[in-house]
């Protein structure tokens, strides 16, 4: 019940700021999609919904791109939870944004897929387009696995649609 209450206020949070907020460094993303999109057995695929925060004020410019920290979490339709923090690169090609990321995190299977370990690693690629100066709509594809450090390592591939807003 509390989860549904929280979801009801996400749109308020996203659209309550003035459009000139694009100069600020905080970026909040909400996303929804499919967990275990390449499920060969057909019994673990489910929906996922998540939220992610990026603080662009903490970026580092390097010779291979601009990097900033990212923190987020998602829950699946089978009560699996993944909480993560990592690093994301940003490559802006006009209105198109490409953002690869890597994040270790804590995974709890709930009634969903057993990934073999509580420590799981998420690698992701996002491709988005700027809707306004401070809003972006994108597609992301991620892979989560434990690098064979767990009892088993089935991994999972996920895809989602992401809406991001700068505050």
Task: Specify the residue positions occupied by each region the protein language model found.
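Residue-level signature of outer-membrane beta-barrel architecture
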Residues: 53-57, 89-91, 129, 143, ...
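Outer-membrane beta-barrel "beta-signal"
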Residues: 47-51, 129, 154-167
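Solvent-exposed loop/turn segments connecting transmembrane beta-strands
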Residues: 37-47, 73-84, 111-118, 148-156
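Transmembrane beta-strand segments that form the barrel wall of outer-membrane beta-barrel proteins
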Residues: 28-36, 64-76, 99-108, 140-145
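Cleavable N-terminal export/targeting peptides
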Residues: 1-25
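Outer-membrane beta-barrel initiation region
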Residues: 22-56
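Short loop/turn motifs that connect adjacent beta-strands in outer-membrane beta-barrel proteins
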Residues: 19-25, 41, 56-67, 92-98, ...
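Membrane-embedded beta-strands that build the outer-membrane beta-barrel scaffold
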Residues: 51, 87, 98, 125-127, ...
């Amino acid at each position: 019940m509390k989860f549904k209450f929280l979801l009801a206020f996400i749109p308020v949070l996203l659209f309550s700021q003035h459009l000139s907020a694009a100069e600020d460094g905080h970026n909040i993303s909400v996303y929804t999609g499919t967990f275990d999109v390449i499920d060969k057995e057909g019994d673990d695929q489910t929906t996922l919904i998540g939220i992610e925060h990026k603080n662009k004020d903490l970026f580092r410019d390097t010779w291979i791109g601009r990097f900033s920290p990212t923190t987020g979490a998602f829950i699946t339709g089978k009560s699996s939870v993944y909480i993560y923090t990592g690093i994301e690169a940003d490559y802006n090609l006009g209105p198109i944004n490409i953002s690869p990321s890597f994040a270790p995190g804590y995974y709890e299977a709930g009634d969903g897929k057993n990934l073999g370990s509580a420590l799981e690693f998420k690698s992701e690629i996002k491709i988005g387009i700027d809707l306004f100066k401070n809003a972006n709509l994108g597609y992301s594809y991620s892979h989560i696995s434990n690098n064979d450090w767990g009892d088993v390592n089935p991994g999972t591939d996920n895809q989602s649609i992401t809406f991001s807003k700068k505050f």
